[in-house]
Amino acid sequence: MSIQQIIEQKIQKEFQPHFLAIENESHLHHSNRGSESHFKCVIVSADFKNIRKVQRHQRIYQLLNEELNHSIHALALHLFTPEEWKAQNETVPHSTKCAGIGR
């Protein structure tokens, strides 16, 4: 099972998201082809209601602790309640390019 599949499986089980997008962004960095080191996760879940943004991130870090310690170098998290997601027009945030790309 790929790292991306593991991330998706764990998040689905823990948060039952209304929307989930996991993007492998390793190709945007100095990573080898097929690498799974940099990910962007957009998670929309009612579980995030009444939880501060820092605490939301902490819950994801705790859930993916093993992967963060062994495989994942960078994890961009965009975490929303269904209401917050609707307020931002259900738009997936764009990622910035790695500062080292093209040097």
From Swiss-Prot:
Q: An example of a Gene Ontology BP annotation on this entry?
A: DNA-templated transcription
Q: InterPro entries given for it?
A: BolA, BolA-like_sf, BolA/IbaG_stress_morph_reg
Q: Which keywords appear in this protein's UniProt record, sorted alphabetically?
A: DNA-binding, Stress response, Transcription, Transcription regulation
Extract the Pfam families matched here: BolA
Q: Which GO terms describe its molecular function?
A: DNA binding
DNA-binding among keywords: yes
The record's Gene Ontology cellular component field reads: cytosol
Task: Give the signal sequence positions.
Answer: none
> What residue ranges are annotated as transmembrane?
none
The function of this protein is: Transcriptional regulator that plays an important role in general stress response.
Q: Which family does it belong to?
A: Belongs to the BolA/IbaG family.
| This protein's name | DNA-binding transcriptional regulator BolA
The species is Haemophilus influenzae (strain ATCC 51907 / DSM 11121 / KW20 / Rd)
Its ancestry begins with: Bacteria, Pseudomonadati, Pseudomonadota, Gammaproteobacteria, Pasteurellales
Q: Which gene encodes it?
A: bolA
